[in-house]
Amino acid sequence: MKKILEVTGLKEQQVAPVVKGLSGLLADLQVYYSNLRGFHWNIRGAEFFVLHEQYEKMYDDLAGKIDEVAERILQLGGKPENRFSEYLKVAEVKEEHELVCAASTLKNVTDTLQIIMAKERAIAEVAGEAGDEVTVDLMIGFLSGQEKLVWMLSAYATK
């Protein structure tokens, strides 16, 4: 059986930077996922009902994106990391523990999305240069939903 890169026509040396970018993104997404779970469990205050439900929707959606990123790494000949201890070494997104009010969790989410979206744009650019349209499409799809989410969260947070 041929390796996937032989079948797709992509070159290992060209997609290596894509795999590296996706691996970093995977680490950030995993930390973000963990933070969202904590926000969901620990949110307090008048916005509890709205944000408790919203954060659950967000981490459910994110679980699918994490799987897509890990599978794309495999499709490009890489091996996705699965150890949280390794994610923490390379992730730009940091673990959160004590955020429980609406304002602080919303700020963290929008700050995190800013980091993640910048990485996705960079990955899309590198993937485009490598002729990897599938990864470009994956990143554009993620960005589309995230930009809408940032707009909605910003509108919600505006007093």
Curated annotation (Swiss-Prot):
The keyword DNA repair does not apply. It is found in: Cytoplasm. PANTHER family: GENERAL STRESS PROTEIN 20U. It comes from Porphyromonas gingivalis (strain ATCC 33277 / DSM 20709 / CIP 103683 / JCM 12257 / NCTC 11834 / 2561). InterPro entries: DPS_DNA-bd, DPS_DNA-bd_CS, Ferritin-like, Ferritin-like_SF, Ferritin_DPS_dom. This is DNA protection during starvation protein. Homododecamer. Responsible for protection of cells against peroxide, especially against hydrogen peroxide. Required for survival in host cells. Although it binds iron, it may not contribute to iron storage. The iron-loaded dps has DNA-binding activity. Fe cation 2 binds at E71. Fe cation 1 binds at H40, D67, E71. It comes from the Bacteria. Keywords: Cytoplasm, Iron, Metal-binding, Oxidoreductase. Belongs to the Dps family. Gene3D superfamilies: 1.20.1260.10. GO terms for cellular component: cytoplasm. Induction: Constitutively expressed but is up-regulated by exposure to atomospheric oxygen in an OxyR-dependent manner. Its EC number is 1.16.-.-. SUPFAM superfamilies: Ferritin-like. GO terms for molecular function: ferric iron binding; oxidoreductase activity, acting on metal ions.
